[in-house]
Amino acid sequence: MTALPQPGPARRWEIPDHLLTIEEYAALGETETGFTELVEGRVVMSPSPSRRHNKAAYLLGRQLESQLPPELDFTLDIDVDLGLAPRGEAGFSRRPDLLIAYREANARVDDEDGMYRAGDVLVAVEVVSPGSKRTDYQVKHDEYADAGIPYYWIVDLTEPVSLVACHQAGEFGYMDAAAVTGTFTTDVPFPVEIDLDALLD
């Protein structure tokens, strides 16, 4: 019988003594558990999402994949430099549960810093968790709009599963459509139909 390898000690983070730029944040790398985001130069740590949450994001990606135009691609759980601060100043980076980005950005993300830029992203998607409702519906809503991300979808797994589709409305930020349950259908930014109930496993 082969023994399973024992996990090593968790990587210890040095708590920064100053507000971080995007470059400093990217240099921190990944944590052993949970994930981080950067908000006005402050590292915000969150626990790892639940299995149900991650499965819903994965199932959403599976439904989207065959419906995306060839120039678009989806990615789960990756940092986005929101570009809300000049280089060298305290930065903003969020990690949407799923994003739809222009395929041409993938090579740069893979080769360079592993981080999308807000201008690469067409749709940011957050799956609401019990501890993230206000952040997803209000804080990220405003940050993604300020960053110029054209579309933001908020998926709430509270039954019945719902999706709120937000789109840029000029100087007013996002305009939010009414929450949809059952099947979400739209023609913008591309024709898509999503069975929301199928996001529950």
Predicted regions and their residues:
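Gly/Pro/Ser/Thr-rich low-complexity, intrinsically disordered segments predominantly at protein N-termini
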Residues: M1-D201
